[in-house]
């Protein structure tokens, strides 16, 4: 094993010089021991990012560099960072290096470990079949359906409900689907990760889930690589066991943000809005590995933070290009008390075609969107002149659009403690029939408020009865 020594420390970036001819390869993991006094030491892992010349390398630290001194001895492990894979990881919580961070015993030394850097599957190995993944969430299943083995993005600014939606999807899909899930917490709140772990333990889903965290308080190196650690675990289940795996990533923006934090320290010239010039390449390397092959599939659901609600920001804009379906969360809808605050006109899916979802579903979805679009166009007239100035046809459109808008909201299982209402799972067939009935005017006599935060149309009629309306 080659041994070098530290020549410079710049926050999370450390330069190391090796003997001539012993330079470690890019992406290799290096280790060094930090003295903590009283004979205690902690191990720090570095990843080689650049070759500087003069037998020196520039590395990114995976944990805090406090206490690192120039001249400290560094050892090349001769291989990239590797994480445990296989059934032993299920029900467990790991960090970016594959070290356990739960209260369970250490993993057996015989557990297989795979490197986190690898090539994406070859073009001819990719699967092309398109099949719908039912989520039980009306607005998603009707207007922007998810694809099994596809990539799905949940876009939204701060506090519009991305994490709650991802938790509901874990609850619905992981329990209904019964397969294996991997959750990668990338640069998000530790509290949310803790809550999620306990919720999954209570529901029993944890037994089929591996969790990897590199949270907000950790250095950029960990946040930059933890998505790859989670993906490596998912790839094993796909490639070696032929499973259909669910990969949840919360939040993909933090992966980009971590790259941008170290980019300047690595000596790269900043690009648009100060992001790293390698933004598209880094995103591509991650996203191209999240795919379905002829052996098994990885369905990924990724939360994407939108800085200042600006969708033209390079980070969310780069992620858009890789996705099969997008669910856009809109702040205006949260202000109206519509949860999940999914924008029915901005959300998209390449599966919303008659060939995939069927003629009836497609027609109902397009009619719902057309009604909501017409309502949006009429809102300016209503704001200036009031409802009375509209034609009878337009009044009917507005009345139905408002019912549709409220009916697109839904009570979530994971939000029971906030709403006091039981969560609901609505099958796709029922969703299509319910919206078809609203479009046909069968429920024009039911008050708008009865449509808020409910599951199926039966729950609407129940609420209406409670309001004293003849159903």
From Swiss-Prot:
* Protein purpose: Produces ATP from ADP in the presence of a proton gradient across the membrane. The catalytic sites are hosted primarily by the beta subunits.
Please tell me where this protein is predominantly located: membrane
Its membrane topology is listed as: Peripheral membrane protein
HAMAP family named in the record: ATP_synth_beta_bact
**What residues does ATP bind to?**
156-163
Which terms are listed as keywords in the entry? ATP synthesis, ATP-binding, Cell membrane, CF(1), Hydrogen ion transport, Ion transport, Membrane, Nucleotide-binding, Translocase, Transport
Family that this chain belongs to: Belongs to the ATPase alpha/beta chains family.
- Protein location: Cell membrane
Documented EC number(s): 7.1.2.2
Q: What is this protein called?
A: ATP synthase subunit beta
InterPro entries, sorted: AAA+_ATPase (IPR003593), ATP-synt_VA_C (IPR055190), ATP_synth_F1_bsu (IPR005722), ATPase_a/bsu_AS (IPR020003), ATPase_alpha/beta_chains (IPR050053), ATPase_F1/V1/A1_a/bsu_N (IPR004100), ATPase_F1/V1/A1_a/bsu_N_sf (IPR036121), ATPase_F1/V1/A1_a/bsu_nucl-bd (IPR000194)
Catalysed reactions, as listed in the record: ATP + H2O + 4 H(+)(in) = ADP + phosphate + 5 H(+)(out)
The gene that this protein is the product of is: atpD
Lineage of the organism: Bacteria, Bacillati, Bacillota, Bacilli, Bacillales
One of the entry's Gene Ontology molecular-function terms is: ATP binding
């Amino acid at each position: 094993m080659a041994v070098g020594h530290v020549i410079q420390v710049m926050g999370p970036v450390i330069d190391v010089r090796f003997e001539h001819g012993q330079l470690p390869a890019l992406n290799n993991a290096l280790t060094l021991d930090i003295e903590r006094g009283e004979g205690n030491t902690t191990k720090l892992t570095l990843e080689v990012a650049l070759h500087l010349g003069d037998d020196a390398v520039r590395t990114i630290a995976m944990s805090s560099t406090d206490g690192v001194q120039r001249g400290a001895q560094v050892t090349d492990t001769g291989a990239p960072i590797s994480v445990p894979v296989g059934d032993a990881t299920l029900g467990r919580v790991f960090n970016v290096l594959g070290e356990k961070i739960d209260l369970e015993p250490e993993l057996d030394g015989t557990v297989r470990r795979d490197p986190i850097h690898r090539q994406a599957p070859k073009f001819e190995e990719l699967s092309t079949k398109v099949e719908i993944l039912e989520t039980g969430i009306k607005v998603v299943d009707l207007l922007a359906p998810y694809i099994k083995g596809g990539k799905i993005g949940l876009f939204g600014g701060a506090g519009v409900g991305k994490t709650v939606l991802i938790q509901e999807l874990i609850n619905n899909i992981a329990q209904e689907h019964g397969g294996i899930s991997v959750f990668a917490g990338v640069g998000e709140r530790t509290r949310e990760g803790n809550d999620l772990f306990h919720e999954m333990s209570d529901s029993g889903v944890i037994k089929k889930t591996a969790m990897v965290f590199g949270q907000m308080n950790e250095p950029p190196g960990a946040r930059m690589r933890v998505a790859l650690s989670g993906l490596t675990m998912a790839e094993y289940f796909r490639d070696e066991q032929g499973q259909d795996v669910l990969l949840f990533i919360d939040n993909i923006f933090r992966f980009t943000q971590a790259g941008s934090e170290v980019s300047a320290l690595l000596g790269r010239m900043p690009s648009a809005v100060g992001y790293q010039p390698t933004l598209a390449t880094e995103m591509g390397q991650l996203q191209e590995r999240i795919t379905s092959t002829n052996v098994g599939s990885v369905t990924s659901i990724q939360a994407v933070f939108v800085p200042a609600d600006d969708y033209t920001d390079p980070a969310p804009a780069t992620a858009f290009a890789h996705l099969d379906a997008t669910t856009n969360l809109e702040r205006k809808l949260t202000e109206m008390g519509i949860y999940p605050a999914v924008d029915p006109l901005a959300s998209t899916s390449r599966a919303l075609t008659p060939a995939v979802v069927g003629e009836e579903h497609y027609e109902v979805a397009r009619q719902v969107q057309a009604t909501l679009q017409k309502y949006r166009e009429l809102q300016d007239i209503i704001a200036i002149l009031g409802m009375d100035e509209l034609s009878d046809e337009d009044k009917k459109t507005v009345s139905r659009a408002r019912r549709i808008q409220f009916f697109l909201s839904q009570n979530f299982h994971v939000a029971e403690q906030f709403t006091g209402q039981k969560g609901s799972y609505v099958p796709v067939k029922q969703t299509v029939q319910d919206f078809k009935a609203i479009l046909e005017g069968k429920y024009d006599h039911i008050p708008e408020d009865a449509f808020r935060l409910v599951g199926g149309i039966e729950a609407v009629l129940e609420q209406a009865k409670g309001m004293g309306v003849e159903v």
